[in-house]
Amino acid sequence: MENVNMVKSKAALLKKFSEPLSIEDVNIPEPQGEEVLIRIGGAGVCRTDLRVWKGVEAKQGFRLPIILGHENAGTIVEVGELAKVKKGDNVVVYATWGDLTCRYCREGKFNICKNQIIPGQTTNGGFSEYMLVKSSRWLVKLNSLSPVEAAPLADAGTTSMGAIRQALPFISKFAEPVVIVNGIGGLAVYTIQILKALMKNITIVGISRSKKHRDFALELGADYVSEMKDAESLINKLTDGLGASIAIDLVGTEETTYNLGKLLAQEGAIILVGMEGKRVSLEAFDTAVWNKKLLGSNYGSLNDLEDVVRLSESGKIKPYIIKVPLDDINKAFTNLDEGRVDGRQVITP
C-alpha cells in the first residue's frame, strides 16, 4: 500500500434513495497533509443512516453516490505527512468535523458548526473496508477496546454523553432525582448505562411501547419501566407527586414531548435528542408557570467521545453489539427500519 495514490476498497454505496445499497469496489485516496487512512474494523448502523437512505435528512453538501456510515472505528494504516498519529493504532472517529474557523469551533463545539463535514452525509463514511479521515484531530485512540465495540461510541455513546451533560444541572436540583429515558433502542443502551455509571443516587424510568424493549431497559439498568400511558401514575408514586427531574427524549415527536412535559417537576426539563417527528409540542401554561424547559441536544464533544471510550474500557459500559458482514448491510437496514434490533448493529467489512 506504500506510495500508491488510491486504495481499492469494497464499500456499500447509496446511489438512489430508498433503494438497496450497492456493494462495489471503490477508490479511496491516499492520505495527504493531516489526513489519515483507517481500515474499518466496525461501523455502527444508526437511525440517521436510515433517514439519509430515505432522503429525508440531506445535509448541505450532500451528493450521490455516497458511502454512508458515521459510527466508525478501525486501525490506522496510512498517514499524511502532518498527521499526529501513527500506523497500527486502533482509533474511533469523531463524527462531526468542524470548519475550525467559526465561533463555535473556537469553543470546541464542533457539533454545532454550520459548516461541519459529517462522514456518511457530506463525505464518504465507514460502510467500507477503508475510510479517509480529514484530520488526525478527529480520532480518539483505543487502548483495550476493539473497533467493533468502539464503533457505536462514535455517535450513540457520544450523543448520550452530550445529552446527559445537558441534563446534569437539572438532576442536581434534587437529592433523589428521577430521570426518564424515553425510547429504548440503540441510544438508550448507552444513555441508561452512562447515567448509572456517573450517578449513584438516581432512579431511572425507561419508557417504551414495546414490552420487549421495556425488559431490555431493565437489563441495561433502568430501575422501573412503563408505557407512556401508565407513566404518570408511576412517576407520581416515585416522587410523592413532585414529578421527574429530567426526561431524555430519544424519540422526539409532538406526542412524546407533550406527554413528557406533563411528567416533569417544577423547573424540570426535557432533553430532546430524537428527531422522529417534524415538530415538538408542550402545554404553554404548564411550561411557563412551572418554569419547565425544552433543550435540544445534538451529538456531543470530542471530550464526550473520549470519556465514553474510557468508561467503556473500565468496564462500566457493556456493549450490546450485533455484528453484520458488509455484504448483509441491506438486511441490517431492514431490521432497524422494522424495529427488530435490540442494541447496535455493527457492520464488519
UniProtKB/Swiss-Prot annotation:
It catalyses: D-arabinose + NADP(+) = D-arabinono-1,4-lactone + NADPH + H(+). It comes from the Archaea. Optimum temperature is 91 degrees Celsius. It is an enzyme of class 1 (oxidoreductase). Binds 2 Zn(2+) ions per subunit. Optimum pH is 8.2. Is more than 50% active in a relatively narrow pH range from 7.3 to 9.3. Zn(2+) 1 binds at residues 46, 70, 155. Its cofactor is Zn(2+). InterPro entries: ADH-like_C, ADH-like_N, ADH_Zn_CS, GroES-like_sf, NAD(P)-bd_dom_sf, Zn_alcohol_dh. One of its GO terms (molecular function) is alcohol dehydrogenase (NAD+) activity. Keywords: Arabinose catabolism, Carbohydrate metabolism, Metal-binding, NADP, Oxidoreductase, Zinc. Its EC number is 1.1.1.427. Homotetramer. Dimer of dimers. Participates in a pentose oxidation pathway that converts D-arabinose to 2-oxoglutarate. Catalyzes the NADP-dependent conversion of D-arabinose to D-arabinono-1,4-lactone. In vitro, can also use L-fucose, L-galactose and D-ribose. Shows highest activity with L-fucose, in combinaison with NAD, and lower activity toward L-galactose and D-ribose. When acting on its physiological substrate, D-arabinose, shows a clear preference for NADP over NAD. PANTHER family: D-ARABINOSE 1-DEHYDROGENASE (NADP(+)), L-THREONINE 3-DEHYDROGENASE. Contains two domains: a catalytic domain (residues 1-154 and 292-344) and a nucleotide binding domain (residues 155-291). The active site resides in a deep cleft between the domains. This is D-arabinose 1-dehydrogenase (NADP(+)). It comes from Saccharolobus solfataricus (strain ATCC 35092 / DSM 1617 / JCM 11322 / P2) (Sulfolobus solfataricus).
